Amino acid sequence: MPQSCPNLNESRHYADLLSLPFTDLRRLLTAARVSAAEVPMAAGLHYNYAAMPVEERHLDLLQGLSDEFDLVGQYQRLLAGERMNVGENRRVLHHLTRGQLGPAVMHDGRDLGAFYREQHQRIFAFAEQVHRGALRGSSGAAFTQVCQIGIGGSDLGPRALYLALQQEARRQGCQLMTAEFLSNVDPDDADQVLARLDLARTLFVLVSKSGTTQETLTNETLVRVALRHQGLDDRAHLVAVTSETSPLAGNSAYRDSFYMDDFVGGRFSSTSAVGAVVLSLAFGPAIFQALLAGAHAQDALALQPDIRHNASLLDALLGVYLRNVLGYPCSAVLPYSQALSRFPAHLQQLDMESNGKSVNRRGEPLPYASGPIIFGEPGTNGQHSFYQLLHQGTDVVPLQFIGFEQAQGQRDLLVQGSTSQDKLNANLAAQLVAFAKGRADENANRHFAGQRPASLIRGARLTAEALGALLAHFENKIMFQGFVWNINSFDQEGVQLGKVLTGQLLAGTAEDEALQAYGRLLGLRPPA
């Protein structure tokens, strides 16, 4: 059972890792290593760890740690439906939304894999009706835009995936609807999003598993008022993605409802109905199905016990080594692909909400560090922003690069002897070597110490399958790290206290004087 799993500091392999001498990246990084230190992933991707400060002796100990903690076995139990979310006594079934890898998971007599597949098929049929004009807005106009209303996992993942797939869909001629996303309760966000929409031709997708999310329901009201102001029937322009037990389920205020359940956490929900509706409407079911196929294939590879053949497991263990042996508190995600512009923000939530924990699965304080701080931006933009600190700052920040040989689009020209894609990838290669090897200079201001660890996920082109594999890779990496740290990666109690205090302020029941004072300072109005 997860509750009986040991802490990291109890591991003999971890103790041996702590005793290993420092590895000089400047010596280690050679052309032969760049070619050899690589693990295949799904959809033609590869995980390259040549610029990581580890040698065979490190990998042997990390393999021992994986075996000692039965990391793949814990993953198998999760797939079989064991209640790995020990804090909420729930199963963890996001893998099942893209395919079956273990036995059938039953709940109250229902096959949950079949339930997720049924919801996908309902969504695909609905999207097809919208695309052929069988379902229209209340004015009779065909829907040409879709807007997802949601926050957190109901926004970050689907938004990142939409942006990542948009150029690929255009290349294939299947950008069927444009999408917008409304998340923040800041009224200016709603104003700006609504100003970009033709409301008569817009279908809104309200996403709230509980049906009670404050920010989402507030924005829903703003949308309904805007629709009515234009003489439109708001009920014809909204569908809901929710749980079957929420107040939104089967509600006549929505044109239709599509379902998820409590076993799929918000930040892991992009391959459930949460992502399926908006992506199938925008690009058609085939693109979303390709995304699912890539994710499922990567999930299957994550069952490989040998870390030298399991990129997600190796990436997880290298991250633990960087965090708990070398003591690095941050990690930067740096995609050299503008299509992945919002992918770091999604990974920030995925990682920090999952592994930002300070107690183990028994509720005991952790005697070691857990999840790192995650941030990032696409290259080459980041090079002209925060890379200065990454190269010469006093803190070492490990780096996760992502790059592709080809652009998604076809429009690229030779400029000064090279294409834009050539320039992009030349910058990526240069950064990998610069971070690892540095440069000696008598002028201290121009001296680069190097020794900055980095990994690279590379592929031919960012396709829907590759994006699915990339998504699943990071989800599984984070899962494995949670197992190593003996924490529950599948709850988020840290976000609850702020919600409680917000509710007190808005209801006028706050008793804390400092809370009341901040409310007054920010011009909070007394409850109506």
Identify what each model region corresponds to:
Residues 13, 21, 54-61, 74, ...:
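General structural feature for long, well-ordered alpha-helical segments within catalytic domains
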Residues 391-394, 402-461:
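Substrate-recognition/cap regions that form aromatic- and gly/pro-loop-enriched pockets
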Residues 144-152, 204-210, 330-337, 373-374, ...:
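Short glycine-rich or small-residue beta-strand-to-loop segments that form or flank ligand, phosphate
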Residues 4-139, 144, 417-428, 435-437, ...:
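Extended, charge-enriched "interface" segments that sit outside catalytic cores
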Residues 161-166, 195-199, 221-223, 255, ...:
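Short, solvent-exposed amphipathic alpha-helical segments in soluble enzyme
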Residues 124-133, 139-306, 504-507:
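Glycine-rich phosphate-binding loops that contact phosphosugars or nucleotide phosphates
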